[in-house]
Amino acid sequence: MNQPSLDELLEKVDSRYTLVVVAAKRARELTERGKTKADGAAVMKPVTAALMEIAQNKVGYKRTRSGIK
C-alpha cells in the first residue's frame, strides 16, 4: 500500500485537526519504542508509519475534555 490519501485518512477521523494530533502522538510512540516497520515492510519514517496504521484502522482515538487520547 502506498501512502494513504488525505481523503482516505479523513474517513477514519472526524476532522483534519484530529488526524494531525492522532498521527503525531502515534509517531512519537513509534519513535520512543523504536518501531517504524509496518507489517514487516522496510523501515519507514514514523509519521508515514502512523498514517498507514490510521488508514488500516490499527490506531484509534478517544476525544476527552482535556484533548485526544
UniProtKB/Swiss-Prot annotation:
Recite the UniProt keywords alphabetically: DNA-directed RNA polymerase, Nucleotidyltransferase, Transcription, Transferase
One GO biological process this protein is involved in is: DNA-templated transcription
Catalysed reactions, as listed in the record: RNA(n) + a ribonucleoside 5'-triphosphate = RNA(n+1) + diphosphate
EC supergroup of this enzyme:
transferase
Recorded hits in Pfam families, A to Z, give: RNA_pol_Rpb6
Does the record carry Oxidoreductase as a key word?
no
The protein's matches in Gene3D superfamilies, at most eight in alphabetical order, are given as:
3.90.940.10
Q: Name one GO cellular component term.
A: DNA-directed RNA polymerase complex
Q: Which domain of life is it from?
A: Bacteria
EC number(s) on file: 2.7.7.6
Q: Which GO terms describe its molecular function?
A: DNA binding; DNA-directed RNA polymerase activity
Q: How does it assemble?
A: The RNAP catalytic core consists of 2 alpha, 1 beta, 1 beta' and 1 omega subunit. When a sigma factor is associated with the core the holoenzyme is formed, which can initiate transcription.
Output the HAMAP family linked to this UniProt entry.
RNApol_bact_RpoZ (MF_00366)
What's this protein's function? Promotes RNA polymerase assembly. Latches the N- and C-terminal regions of the beta' subunit thereby facilitating its interaction with the beta and alpha subunits.
Q: Which family does it belong to?
A: Belongs to the RNA polymerase subunit omega family.
Q: What is this protein called?
A: DNA-directed RNA polymerase subunit omega
The species this protein was found in:
Pelotomaculum thermopropionicum (strain DSM 13744 / JCM 10971 / SI)
